[in-house]
UniProtKB/Swiss-Prot annotation:
Keyword Signal: yes
Skewed-composition ranges (Basic residues): 67-92, 133-146
Start-end of Basic and acidic residues biased regions: 93-106
Gene name of this polypeptide: ng3
Protein name, UniProt field: Protein new-glue 3
Length: 146
């Protein structure tokens, strides 16, 4: 790779310097997809090196674009599945309202206990079903690829 880049650089420098010196009389320039090929009467070595770099560049692109081998792909999945936050309303009993109006700390602790117990019971079941769905989907896609 370095060798072809150096040759290409030398060829372009030579192309720029030849018209300045006025050494060549008939110079034709044709541009291809990857490099500039120059043919002149005085610089035949530049032409030869330039054509080799052009062919090398085209073979590299054609070999990379053709799909002869099946490469093994590794997929990285995110472990955490993001879900929208559910809003839970805590409904109080009339007996709780009478006590809690005077004491703030007791209501906070009750809210924490209720929200943590309800979220753990319902949250674990929903995450299990979600994970199994994802597992099935991954298994299907893995079967398709192989």
């Amino acid at each position: 790779m370095r060798y072809s880049c150096v040759l290409l650089l030398l060829a372009t420098v030579a192309c720029l310097l030849i018209p300045q010196t006025g050494g060549s009389t008939a110079t034709t320039t044709s541009t291809s997809a990857s490099a500039t090929t120059t043919t002149s009467a005085s610089a035949t070595t530049t032409t030869a090196s330039d054509t080799t770099t052009t062919t090398a560049a085209t073979t590299t692109t054609s070999s990379s674009s053709s799909k002869s081998k099946k490469k093994k792909r590794t997929y990285h999945y995110t472990r955490h599945v993001y879900r929208p936050k559910r809003i839970r309303h805590i409904y109080r009993h009339k007996a709780d309202d009478d006590e809690s109006s005077t004491d703030r700390t007791s209501t906070r602790s009750r809210r924490r206990r209720r929200s943590s117990s309800s979220s753990s019971s319902s949250g674990s079941t929903s995450s299990r079903s979600g994970n199994s769905r994802i597992r099935r989907r991954r298994a299907r896609s893995a079967r398709r690829l192989s």
